[in-house]
């Protein structure tokens, strides 16, 4: 409906002005191009309105608002992009810039729908005004339209040309965009054109613009909102900020201190300048890669330094640096942190880098080769002093230095390290700026440590890794601390078999292992035997079997030591020594291993917890650490060493253990193979951890047993 009136009117008074622009055709085409029915009006008016910005007065008129915006935006380029957003900056316009006018258009359309009558009235009023004042205003506005018309007339070829003229207009009319944006939504749009050309708007602004564009329209409310692509990366993100302390400090430092070092590699010197640009313009992006990629020099320096730094350690550190961090410098800092190899690298790499403490990575890389000799002498001591701290100096700028925890302490670290490396201080002074200060200081100060947040891979790994002691503490329920090592070792093999001598113990160990591998039922039988001998032990056996996933027989060895006080324990004491040897290697090792693995930690008392854990694991659920479930589980686990810790850890550990546990015995047969495998694994590791674990278990098991 708008189109008809617009056309008639557009041709009427606008024709005079728009004929110059060859506006009528253009409007239609553009409206079609925009695929916005009413866009014809806005397009038509855009030219007209551009010429008659007096007409822009009618912000009330939705079309006019668009016209005004369009006209203003168009001169600025916002308007054309909506029509030809695809041409100049597809990404930018699609993401950021289209937001302005497209949002307006959508809002306008909605407004039309919402207040079609009002809009019509406004249109009529505007049309009348245009007709009456169109000629008058057009003369006033004509000059502007004439500019546009001149461009468009010169480019009457069509909107394609027109769109490009508008680009020109954007360039030539850049001032106009500012003027046009005055009250138009496009102002943020057009104005940002000028301001944003350096870079895309902040993502927040982008979302506001683009989201706002899409929010009002939301025609399909039943569907999720359209995906808002992040602003195109034509320029640095505003959100990144220009605070590239390390990079700035390094690059400027590179320029200042590097002259000698940097001169050696003139290209790099230039690149250092580029890195400065990267820091300032690209910010964190420039920094992280400024060292490795954007800077170009740092990465190359690192690569060269690695091969060139003849020191194997230096190469290693360089490799580490390059591998660990994009920039060799960062890598070196990390390498330094890494350790002795790092230190070697420090002497080699850092020595050269000290001359340019901030650009240390580059200096190290470049200076290590060329400035190395002189700088090494000078900086070798300094490097060594600062190198432990320096590694952070190379801090890979994962985050803007200001965010680094040590940012505030940069002065102190700078004073200390830079005292060591006066040049670093100088560099820092040169590079330190309000925004850069923390980071530049960080360069030298980073030596303390590196604050790196590596979010490249968002992997949340939550694992409860109980100390071997904790796990085994639960395993040895009744073992008093008094019988910790001796009773544990002695009775373990003999637990099941009190009467059996040391000779029987090896077989017992074997039997236990076999039973654990073969089936838990055999272990159950043994467990029952143990129970006959020691009710407490049987419970211990069950616990250990359930906790460790070992058959009770297997667990019994520990259970017996666990109950050193029991008569069986006394009997075991003498026989145990023999068993201790045999059991200790294969079985004691097996049991503690499981404990280390986290299985040993769930004794019979935790059977409920184990079952819960198994079910949860199968359901891929876990009690919330904050929830009462964890507490309940801990209580169930009743581990003296920290139920809260045990509960979660026990849960997942128990899941593994349960298969072999007496509680899980129905499944044990199926799990026997797993148990056998795990047992072999356990035996391997347990021999090492057995003694310490057993002692701990014995001490803490009594509590667990009591619980």
From Swiss-Prot:
Forms a ternary complex with MAGI2 and SH3KBP1; recruits DDN to the cytoplasm. Interacts with MAGI1. Interacts with ACTN1 and may interact with WWC1. Interacts with the podocyte slit diaphragm proteins CD2AP, NPHS1 and NPHS2; the interaction with CD2AP and NPHS1 is direct. It is a peripheral membrane protein. Specifically expressed in forebrain structures, particularly in neocortex, olfactory bulb, hippocampus, caudate-putamen, and limbic system (at protein level). Also detected in spleen, liver, kidney and placenta (at protein level). Residues 105-127, 524-544, 692-707 have a biased composition (Basic and acidic residues). This is Dendrin. It comes from Rattus norvegicus (Rat). Residues 359-369 have a biased composition (Basic residues). It is found in: Cell projection, Dendritic spine membrane; Cytoplasm; Endoplasmic reticulum membrane; Perikaryon. There are 2 forms of 81 kDa and 89 kDa detected in brain by an antibody raised against a C-terminal peptide arguing for alternative N-terminal sequences.
